Amino acid sequence: MTTLDDKLLGEKLQYYYSSSEEEDSDHEDKDRGRGALAGSSMPADADLAGEGISVNTGPKGVINDWRRFKQLETEQREEQCREMERLIKKLSLSCRSHLDEEEEQRKQKDLQEKISGKMTLKDLAVMNEDQDDEEFLQQYRKQRMEEMRQQLYQGPQFKQVFEIPSGEGFLDMIDKEQRSTLIMVHIYEDGIPGTEAMNGCMLCLAAEYPAVKFCRVRSSVIGASSRFTRNALPALLIYKGGELIGNFVRVTDQLGEDFFAVDLEAFLQEFGLLPEKEVLLRTSVRNSATCHSEDSDLEID
């Protein structure tokens, strides 16, 4: 329970004004206001705008803006370099393709000129030493072989042995045949050693050399003497252009009485009296047993 003194003192305290209290209040208000300003202020390095833009104009902001600018500049330069490299590569490829095409056309033109016969033997010898021209040499040889084959087979094809029935037929066969045709005439008589072997060889070679005309005639038909028949048969006469270019009498002296087609072929090739063949000898030439079989008959006209 309060006394009268307390009440009196209390009322005085309520209405009592102290200068120290006012100063304390002012200090508190200032501190409170300073704290509010500090809380509302933004950091020095804060960015409030988009990428590459800073509202901070302080030293750190300027440095960051410069770094970002240099980074963008470097990226742009690298992209330009890559684009330039792609363009250069594309242009180089297109130029190379065009140049390669022109070079190939030039090579083909040179090749055709050389193959057409504009190359001398000296040029051919030089190219044989140059491995880089191997492709040309292969094509050249191939075309030359084809040309020789056409020259060999462009005339008539015979492929059999012709029997000459008379002396007049013998002369006509020599004089009226094409001048480029090679004619081989076997003069024979039955019972002469080596006659049967020669007949079989002629049959085989006629199939192997269709451009060569193989014939046979009895010595009695052309009026040969008995001495010639006994001592010179079997004989082989070779004509070309109406002239006698080969004359082999008593062939058995060189080949023996039992010889084969391959033996006669090698003998004639040794003297250059058979054209070169494009292909190897077929089995029918090498297999003399087939050519000399008793069941096979000569194709005689």
Swiss-Prot record:
Compartmental location: Cell projection, Cilium
Stretches assigned to the Phosducin domain: 37-299
Gene3D superfamilies, alphabetized: Glutaredoxin, Phosducin, domain 2
Chain residue ranges for the region called Thioredoxin fold: 158-301
List of residues that carry N-acetylthreonine: T2
GO biological process entries: cell projection organization; heterotrimeric G-protein complex assembly; positive regulation of smoothened signaling pathway; regulation of G protein-coupled receptor signaling pathway; visual perception
Entry keyword set: Acetylation, Cell projection, Chaperone, Cilium biogenesis/degradation, Phosphoprotein, Sensory transduction, Vision
Pfam families: Phosducin
GO cellular component: cilium; cytoplasm
Post-translational modification Phosphoserine, affected residues: S20, S25, S226, S293, S296
Superkingdom to which the source organism belongs: Eukaryota
Region (Disordered): 15-53
PANTHER family, per database record: PHOSDUCIN-LIKE PROTEIN
Family: Belongs to the phosducin family.
Subunit organization: Forms a complex with the beta and gamma subunits of the GTP-binding protein, transducin. Interacts with the CCT chaperonin complex.
Function summary: Functions as a co-chaperone for CCT in the assembly of heterotrimeric G protein complexes, facilitates the assembly of both Gbeta-Ggamma and RGS-Gbeta5 heterodimers. Also acts as a positive regulator of hedgehog signaling and regulates ciliary function.
Annotated protein name in UniProt: Phosducin-like protein
Source species: Bos taurus
